[in-house]
């Protein structure tokens, strides 16, 4: 049984680059000050959580899953301006609810895998989806207007989540809760 437990300082901004090949990872970012994060998972199971708002804006959050599974709770609390999510042949269940008061751009690329993304109900959403007839897209909580999917109750003074989604043979499920 190989395991590693460690803590990071909670009083200084941290830039993280995590590359985890195989195995199970449980990562709790709560109480950290995060300025930039890159997470790469190979064939393992990764669980990430953030239960309190990041006290600073995180410039960039990148999540790259290979064949493994990725689950996250409270990622909106990371307070990122730009998010890149790449899902190869694995799966990602991402709860992006949390506290953020600015617009965020989320770019999602799915190959043969699947992603379920939960966004907070109290934000505007504008999504552009690039897919083909082999892709599965579920955007039931959004309405299609022209080339975009939008929140039905758009309010100009609340944050907007801009989604740019590309799907190959995989599936994408976007929900508002």
Question: Where are the model-predicted features located?
Answer:
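Right-handed parallel beta-helix
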Residues: 17-56
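Short, surface-exposed interaction patches in beta-rich subdomains
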Residues: 1, 48-177
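Membrane-embedded segments
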Residues: 1-13, 17-26
């Amino acid at each position: 049984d190989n395991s590693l437990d460690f803590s990071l300082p909670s009083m200084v901004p941290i830039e993280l680059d995590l590359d985890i090949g195989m195995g199970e990872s449980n990562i709790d970012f709560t109480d950290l000050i995060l300025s930039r994060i890159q997470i790469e998972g190979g064939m393992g199971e990764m669980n990430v959580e953030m239960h309190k708002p990041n006290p600073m804006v995180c410039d960039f959050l990148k999540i790259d899953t290979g064949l493994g599974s990725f689950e996250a709770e409270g990622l909106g609390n990371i307070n990122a301006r730009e998010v890149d999510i790449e899902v190869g042949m694995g799966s990602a269940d991402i709860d992006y609810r949390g506290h953020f008061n600015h617009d965020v751009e989320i770019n999602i690329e799915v190959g043969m895998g699947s992603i379920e993304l939960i966004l907070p109900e109290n934000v505007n959403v504008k999504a552009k989806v690039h897919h083909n007839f082999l892709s599965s897209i579920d955007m039931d909580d959004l309405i299609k207007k022209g080339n975009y999917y939008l929140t039905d109750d758009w309010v100009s003074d609340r944050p907007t989540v801009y989604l740019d989604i590309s799907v190959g043979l995989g599936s994408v499920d976007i929900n508002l809760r």
